[in-house]
Amino acid sequence: MSGLADRALLYTLFISIPTISYLATFPFFSTIVKYRSNYSPKRIELDQEGNRSHPVAGVNSYFAMMKRVKQLEGQAGFYKGIVPCSLLLAFLRSIPVLIRAGIIVIRKRDLWHSLAIALFSEIVVLPIRVITFRAMTTPYRLPWYNPIFSLRTLLSVTERKHPWLLFLTPGLLVSVVLSIVHGTLVMSLLKTLSFPVATRYPLARSSPTQLGIYLIASIVSVLISCPLSVVQVRLSIQRNHPPRDYEIIEREGQAESSGVVYSGAEEDVVSLRSEGDPYKGFFDCIRRIVNEEGYSRLLCAWWFDLVFLWYSGLIMPWLQSFF
């Protein structure tokens, strides 16, 4: 009986510890998506109807966005999008398990096969990732018990009629592919150079020179991955509409938002770019962000990615060495 009790306790800890960690860290990732999606032009411009845009004032840092979410939406605002994000992580985490179990057979495990698996996985879950980002940034309150209503709020009429358009969002697939290629090549480079940081005990087996090179390489990597992440968030939250007049798009948006409840009682947490003048592609998104918001916007909260990279590459393996 004691063996059965010990096993039950072990299984409980195995499930509860990752769950608690996930719930504790989710608000930080939710805030980074909100911060990178926030449209903050250097000057106020008129839209096609002659109305002035109203960017969120005072949100010029990651922690300012976190404070704003807390003030306007409360704790619930930090957990927007947790349901689709959980489905996304469950799918991505299941792939290595299926490979180890032999359900998914991979004859060769070289760079190209790893890249192909990563690309296939990300393309499959692309709609869920889009829905997750939109759920995190929407000004509306999404009920947990009514996914149909939430999807109707997050997706445009055109996207609900033609779901495959999510894959064809201008520039989105390019940003996803570049992010996967970049991440796969970085890990392959570390293993090729035989860095102990790519092993289970990085801090114990790394020389100061190796750690220094790794830290510099990770900074360069973040300078590439951060702009890709910003572009991916911006393109994901941009809904697809047919090429019609701006007034028709506005009426469609009003019809879609009927019956919804705003999360913030006073104002929107995130200032989103007008859907009447969308980004036309990957490079157009970069060009407009630079022209309208400045180069620094492409690197907003770059330190967040760097801390996460160091944590997953150095600190986490070091902590695992004690168990």
What are these regions (language model features)?
Residues 1-323:
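Matrix-facing interhelical linker segments
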